[in-house]
Structure formats: structure tokens, C-alpha cells
From Swiss-Prot:
Protein name as catalogued: Large ribosomal subunit protein bL20c
Subcellular location: Plastid, Chloroplast
Stored NCBIfam families: rplT_bact
Listed GO CC annotations: chloroplast; ribonucleoprotein complex; ribosome
Record-linked Gene3D superfamilies: 6.10.160.10, Ribosomal protein L20
Reported function: Binds directly to 23S ribosomal RNA and is necessary for the in vitro assembly process of the 50S ribosomal subunit. It is not involved in the protein synthesizing functions of that subunit.
MF terms in GO: rRNA binding; structural constituent of ribosome
């Protein structure tokens, strides 16, 4: 069996890994094996971070809505329950933006729903 020289393909693969890892520190950007491992770790961390980001933003929106609606005497859970009951399709992101930019509008929404 003849020997296969993997010159171009191997160089292309390593160059792609080096390009990805060029911003890493120390040997993680220079050595192929450690750069490959760090690339895998970076991709795993970014995947995990995207899921965590969704959770964190949802928590932030809920906190903002709750802070504004409690000033009006309505807890967050009751507001969301009444929104669902009246079939108003306002998600938490939009409600949080309304709570920050225009509190009176959110007060009007909550007063209309609760009645």
C-alpha cells in the first residue's frame, strides 16, 4: 500500500483552526492540538451561553414588569394570568419595553385587563 501525503488538506484544516484561534492567548493560538481543543471548548461555551442568555433576559424582563406593576398594586403573576384570560398577545419582552419607556401605558393596560 502506498503512502498518502496529506499536505494540502492537512495544512488547510490547520490554517482554518489557527484562524479561529488567532485571538486566543499563548499556546492556545499557536499549537495545533491545543488550538483544536480550545476551539471545541469555545464552541461549547458559546452554545451554553446562548441558552443562558435566553434565560437571563427572560428573568430581567419579568423583574422589570413586576417592579412596575407592583407600584400599581398588581403582582406580575396576576397581570400575566389576566393577559392570557383576555387573549392579549403581548410577550414579556414587549411588556418590559413598555414598562421602561412608558409606565402610564402599562398602568392603563393592567387597569383595563383587571376590570
Amino acid at each position: 500500500m502506498t503512502r498518502v501525503r496529506r499536505g494540502y488538506i492537512a495544512r488547510r484544516r490547520r490554517r482554518k483552526i489557527r484562524l479561529f484561534a488567532s485571538s486566543f492567548r499563548g499556546a492556545h493560538s499557536r499549537l495545533t492540538r491545543t488550538a483544536t481543543q480550545q476551539k471545541i471548548r469555545a464552541l461549547v461555551s458559546s452554545h451554553r451561553g446562548r441558552g443562558r442568555q435566553k434565560r437571563d433576559f427572560r428573568r430581567l424582563w419579568i423583574t422589570r414588569i413586576n417592579a412596575v406593576t407592583r407600584e400599581n398594586g398588581v403582582p406580575y403573576s396576576r397581570l400575566i394570568h389576566d393577559l392570557r384570560k383576555k387573549q392579549l398577545l403581548l410577550n414579556r419582552k414587549i411588556l418590559a419595553q413598555i414598562a421602561i419607556s412608558n409606565r402610564n401605558c402599562l398602568y392603563m393596560i393592567s387597569n383595563d385587563i383587571i376590570k
